């Protein structure tokens, strides 16, 4: 288990915590932040947090940025909160490490 995410090697799934900032100038993953001793990946999203628009844009952005299928990305916690838990299916751990390490400064 990495301190930034929980990877299940038998199912090729990962749980990842996001700290989302809606109404941003651009869609951007910046780095990590610790909130209540829990690490979160910081994600700025252009969409407003109304009627699921920001949640939809989160899924679209992550799928495009990380070259994943939209159907393999699901928000499982925090639908109406800026702190979210994302489930990503069908992802290789080596590829996931490459993605995550690219945001660590």
From Swiss-Prot:
GO terms for cellular component: cytoplasm. NCBIfam families: DUF167 family protein, PRK01530.1. This is UPF0235 protein RF_1332. Belongs to the UPF0235 family. It comes from Rickettsia felis (strain ATCC VR-1525 / URRWXCal2). It comes from the Bacteria.
């Amino acid at each position: 288990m990495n301190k930034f995410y929980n990877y299940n090697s038998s199912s090729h799934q990962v749980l990842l915590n996001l700290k989302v900032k809606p109404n941003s100038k651009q869609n951007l993953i910046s780095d990590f932040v610790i909130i209540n001793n829990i690490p979160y990946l910081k994600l700025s999203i252009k969409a407003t947090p109304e009627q699921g628009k920001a949640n939809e844009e989160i899924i679209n952005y992550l799928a495009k940025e990380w070259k994943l299928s939209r159907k393999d990305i699901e928000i499982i916690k925090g639908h109406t909160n800026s702190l979210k838990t994302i489930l990503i299916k069908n992802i290789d751990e080596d590829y996931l490490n490459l993605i995550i390490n690219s945001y660590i400064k």
